[in-house]
Every structure is written in C-alpha cells, then in structure tokens.
Amino acid sequence: MDDSSYYRSRGAEIVERAGYNYYFAEDGKKALQMYSKIRPDYVTMDICMPIMDGLEATKAICTKFPKAKILICSSVGHIPVYRQQAFANGACGILPKSYDLDDLEQAIEEADMIK
C-alpha cells in the first residue's frame, strides 16, 4: 500500500519475484477496504499516504483482523516515534523504502514468528 506509483510498481516486481500475488491501494482507506475483501498473507504499508495514513490503516486493519501481518515500508520508518507507533498499532516489521528481495524475505520470516 503506497501512494507512489513508482514504489507500487517496484514493490510489485519484488513481491512477484518472491512468488506472491501483488495488490495495491494508494491510500489508507482503500488499503483497509482491500484488506477486508482480499485478506492477503502480508501487507507492505507506507506511513505517509493521503486520506488515511499508514499508521491509522495499520491500526484499523489489526484491530479488525488481529492476525494481519503488516510490514511498514516507509522512508520515515527508521524514525523511532514512527517505529514505536507502527508496532503499537499492530505492525510486525519495518522495511526500508528501498527494500530488495532479501529484505522482504527476512521481514516475512520475522512476521511469521510474531503472528
């Protein structure tokens, strides 16, 4: 889930190389709606998005679906206050915005251990 078309297409390429299907939403509200319909195994969620930010969307999804595995993927995810809020809202991992296949596979492994 990312409002940037560049990062959505880049994410799709990496996720598909890992063997997963890729769906996207460009804002947090659509992310919540899409999660409710599709129930994906994993979600990569940007923090800074329009309408509903990724932290709010993460909290809404994890409140409704406690087993949701959300990986925050944001250029501000390394900032302590955002990391703390992401985990408090139910995220189970943080990825750098410029993640690669190895980063994704490691984050998925860690998410599987948490939830």
Predicted regions mapped to residue ranges:
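Acidic, metal-coordinating helix/loop segments flanking the phosphotransfer/catalytic sites
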Residues: F24-Y42
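Alpha4 helix (beta4-alpha4-beta5 surface) of REC/receiver domains from two-component response regulators
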Residues: E56, G77-L95, Q106
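Active-site residues of response regulator receiver
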Residues: D46
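Receiver (REC) domain active-site loop signature in two-component systems and cognate sites
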Residues: M49
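C-terminal output helix
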Residues: Y99-E109
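Hydrophobic/aromatic residues positioned on beta-strands within the core alpha/beta folds
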Residues: C73-S74
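Acidic catalytic/metal-coordinating carboxylates
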Residues: D27-K30, D53-A57
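Two-component/phosphorelay signaling modules centered on CheY-like receiver
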Residues: S5-Y23, N89
